[in-house]
């Protein structure tokens, strides 16, 4: 399949093996895993970082197989989930960084183009999250107020 904003194909990569239960060698102590996820979140880690730490440091290849819940669901149950989904937050941070760069470098046309592409991805994601009711119906991305949104 092709990339979204390029005229080239995607890259091949490995695929996680299909499993219905956690492997025998993995750490499957449900309460300890949930406690560790909550602790990592309180330290300021994102859900992606939590997943990497759980895999690399604690030997949990899939939190969902070990606990029956995804990381975001565990965080929601403990009132630690963020209001804005992580992928949307990352794209907004990227767009903010580009806007700051363009404020100092007004003639950087390549970065202007990248900003347009990134903000179109943001709008597309917002449309999806509003339709799937993960964001309120009146939620709109505005570059002027984006920094305030991320500080919450």
From Swiss-Prot:
One of its GO terms (biological process) is translation. Keywords: Ribonucleoprotein, Ribosomal protein. One of its GO terms (molecular function) is structural constituent of ribosome. GO terms for cellular component: cytosolic small ribosomal subunit. The keyword Acyltransferase does not apply. CDD domains: Ribosomal_S15p_S13e. Coiled coil: none annotated. SUPFAM superfamilies: S15/NS1 RNA-binding domain (SSF47060). Belongs to the universal ribosomal protein uS15 family. Part of the 30S ribosomal subunit. This is Small ribosomal subunit protein uS15. It comes from Methanospirillum hungatei JF-1 (strain ATCC 27890 / DSM 864 / NBRC 100397 / JF-1).
